[in-house]
């Protein structure tokens, strides 16, 4: 079974409270999504492999730890996942960015794919999938399935908030994919929205519906 990590750092919780507030406008919401993603990325990358290298300092030659040469790809689920990308890129500026376009059918609540563009060497990369909301889990499950069909093997899922139902669904469908969240909320309502949630992340990020 995959590991579920709730990253409850005080700065993350503080910013998340502002993001939940319906009075917070798109500009501030967008900035805080990026900031929280950057703070979360510290924990999401904790288990990346290191290797020992020899470095010459101004004083002497010494051995240091560096990332083990494994390439990283950030794959946002469009459109809301885009809001988290720059925060992760600030810590991993050499990462490539793929895109998976999925939207949720409001009647069936099922995800529908409309776009997919990934790095050609996706099978060699350590992948961080970003999506602010893990509600039913349908979009995340489909995005991860698509990545695996393209050869991806090393995948982490990074969300701002999630419902227990969505977390359980992803774990059942992809028990090898670890999940990282800033908050595990109470439940889904009858419309499939996270409670208490923060509204529609895409709408609030971009100021459109």
Swiss-Prot record:
Residues bound to uracil: 194, 199-201
Binding site for 5-phospho-alpha-D-ribose 1-diphosphate: 79, 104, 131-139, 200
Pathway: Pyrimidine metabolism; UMP biosynthesis via salvage pathway; UMP from uracil: step 1/1
Keywords assigned: Allosteric enzyme, Glycosyltransferase, GTP-binding, Magnesium, Nucleotide-binding, Transferase
GO molecular function: GTP binding; magnesium ion binding; uracil phosphoribosyltransferase activity
Keyword Cell membrane: no
Catalysed transformations (reactions): UMP + diphosphate = 5-phospho-alpha-D-ribose 1-diphosphate + uracil
Required cofactor names: Mg(2+)
EC number: 2.4.2.9
Cross-referenced Pfam families: UPRTase (PF14681)
Cofactor: how bound: Binds 1 Mg(2+) ion per subunit. The magnesium is bound as Mg-PRPP.
Classification via SUPFAM superfamilies: PRTase-like
Activity control note: Allosterically activated by GTP.
GO biological process terms held by the UniProt record: UMP salvage; uracil salvage
Family named by the database record: Belongs to the UPRTase family.
Job description of the protein: Catalyzes the conversion of uracil and 5-phospho-alpha-D-ribose 1-diphosphate (PRPP) to UMP and diphosphate.
Protein name as catalogued: Uracil phosphoribosyltransferase
Originating organism: Clostridium acetobutylicum (strain ATCC 824 / DSM 792 / JCM 1419 / IAM 19013 / LMG 5710 / NBRC 13948 / NRRL B-527 / VKM B-1787 / 2291 / W)
């Amino acid at each position: 079974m995959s590991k579920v990590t709730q990253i409850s750092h005080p700065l993350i919780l503080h910013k998340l409270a502002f993001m939940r507030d319906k009075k917070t406008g798109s500009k501030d919401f967008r900035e805080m999504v990026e900031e929280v993603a950057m703070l979360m990325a510290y924990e999401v990358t904790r288990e990346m492999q290191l290797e020992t290298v020899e470095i010459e300092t101004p004083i002497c030659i010494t051995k240091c730890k560096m990332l083990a040469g494994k390439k990283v790809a950030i794959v946002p689920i469009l459109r809301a996942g885009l809001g988290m990308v720059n925060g992760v890129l600030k810590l991993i500026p050499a990462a490539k960015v793929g895109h998976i376009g999925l939207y949720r059918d409001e009647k069936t609540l099922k995800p529908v794919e409309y776009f997919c563009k990934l790095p050609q060497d996706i099978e060699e990369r350590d992948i961080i999938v970003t999506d602010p909301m893990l509600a039913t889990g349908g979009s995340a499950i489909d995005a991860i399935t698509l990545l695996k069909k393209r050869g991806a093997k090393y995948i982490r899922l990074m969300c701002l908030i999630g419902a227990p139902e969505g977390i359980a669904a992803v774990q059942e469908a992809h028990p090898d994919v670890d999940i990282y969240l800033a908050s595990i909320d109470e439940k889904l309502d009858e419309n499939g929205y996270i409670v208490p949630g923060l509204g529609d992340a895409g709408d609030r990020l971009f100021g459109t519906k």
